[in-house]
Swiss-Prot record:
A zinc finger (C4-type) spans 60-75. Belongs to the RecR family. This is Recombination protein RecR. May play a role in DNA repair. It seems to be involved in an RecBC-independent recombinational process of DNA repair. It may act with RecF and RecO. Residues 83-178 form the Toprim domain. Keywords: DNA damage, DNA recombination, DNA repair, Metal-binding, Zinc, Zinc-finger. HAMAP family: RecR (MF_00017). It comes from Rhodopseudomonas palustris (strain BisB18). GO terms for molecular function: DNA binding; zinc ion binding. Transmembrane segments: none annotated. PROSITE patterns: RECR, TOPRIM. CDD domains: TOPRIM_recR.
Amino acid sequence: MAAAVAGPEIERLIQLLAKLPGLGPRSARRAALHLIKKREALMAPLASALQVAIERIQVCKVCGNIDTQNPCTVCTDPRRDPSIIVVVADVADLWALERAHAASGRYHVLGATLSPLDGVGPDDLSIDALVARAHDPQVSEIVLALNATVDGQTTAHYITDLLMEAGVKVTRLAHGVPVGGELDYLDEGTLSAAMRQRTLF
């Protein structure tokens, strides 16, 4: 029987860190050691930030974003265009669009995409709330900012069908050549989409 490498408290820390995305047991062990070595500079502030997150962070009742206020700062920002709702699968996608300063409207977070293989159906997503928001007279466009995967496209088609009676314009993000991309390295699907969605120069 192998001897314990660390005490139970440290092993518990390692096990919890290993549950984070992208951290396996070995990476979690290294992260735990780093935190312990930097106890005052890193571990204590991290513990404090986690406690604040537990106490204050909540899900926005309007769009599904996470924030310390409810409704969130995006929903209450008067500079946002209330006529546009940008639909994303999860909060990470919302953050990506915000970092790029790519969206001027408000958001709606579905929580995931439809994925029959993973057991994710329409009832698991925030689709009913989106349809209700689309019927607001202020709303004129729904932008489907979903991944260009099979699940993302399936979700986009499903939502588009539901929004037909709302009388809003439904658009989706363009797919094509990335900035700095070389054609020789792109897959056929991306090249085909880029050709179909070409614009005037």
